[in-house]
């Protein structure tokens, strides 16, 4: 019965994509409950997302022209195997395996976070935002929508709101340190940039290795050394540090 409902929901999604003149170029089953579409579409992504999500039981986990978000339950090896991450190609990637402390344990609350319905903005975050509800209400008054109650999502929506209103990624990261309270370290990926920001106390760990060929960041140095065989020198970003790299 469940599989039949999933097939019916996919058929409804296909129908609405056609109604919006979105051309499905490729679709496949990522898991038994998730589908991945490659479409040709020149219209309003916000309108498309709203129309698809109006279907009962259907949720868009990410939508973009350059970034692809993978969100699911399980450890890194499990999720990589489910979605074939070893076959992905690109210039930059962010990821976060975490234990949920104040949010639900479900796909919606998994990292990376997407800022609905903005294209190509993703965030991973370690920490806690203490003025979450105040900042969320302000962003909602500006017309933004939240898909969860996790404070990490606020950083994605905040960043998307700033970039949409003409701020650079570096400006957005610096302003977030001034306007958002709490202890946090977070990374932002856009179509062509990677950004880092740490709060005023730098309580949450981050280790950075940078060379002419690669930029690697992790909560623990052992994670970087696991993928770089030679001896390296790492750096711990300081409080209020902001960095942006071009992909």
Indicate where each model-derived feature is located.
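Conserved short alpha-helical segments that host acidic/polar catalytic motifs at enzyme active sites
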Residues: 1-247
């Amino acid at each position: 019965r469940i599989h039949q409902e999933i097939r019916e929901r996919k058929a409804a999604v296909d129908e609405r994509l056609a109604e919006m003149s979105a051309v499905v170029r490729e679709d496949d089953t990522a898991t038994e409950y998730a589908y991945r579409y490659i479409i040709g579409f020149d219209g309003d992504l916000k309108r498309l997302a709203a129309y698809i999500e109006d279907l009962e039981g259907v949720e868009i986990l990410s939508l973009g022209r350059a970034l692809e978000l993978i969100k699911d339950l399980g450890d890194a090896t499990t999720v990589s195997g489910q979605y074939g991450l070893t076959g992905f190609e690109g210039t930059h990637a962010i990821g976060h395996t975490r234990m949920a402390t104040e949010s639900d344990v479900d796909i919606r609350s998994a990292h990376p976070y997407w800022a609905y319905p903005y294209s190509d903005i993703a965030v991973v975050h370690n920490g806690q935002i203490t003025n979450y509800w105040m900042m969320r209400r302000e962003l909602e008054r500006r017309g933004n929508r939240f898909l969860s109650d996790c404070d990490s999502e606020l950083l994605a929506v905040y960043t998307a709101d700033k970039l949409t209103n003409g701020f650079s990624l570096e400006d957005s990261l610096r302003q977030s340190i001034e306007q958002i309270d709490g202890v946090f370290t977070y990374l932002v990926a856009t179509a062509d940039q990677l950004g880092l920001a740490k709060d005023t106390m730098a309580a949450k760990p981050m280790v950075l290795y940078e060379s002419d060929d690669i930029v690697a960041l992790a909560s623990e140095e052992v994670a970087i050394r696991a993928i770089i065989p030679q001896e390296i020198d790492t750096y711990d970003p300081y409080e209020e540090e902001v960095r942006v790299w071009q992909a």
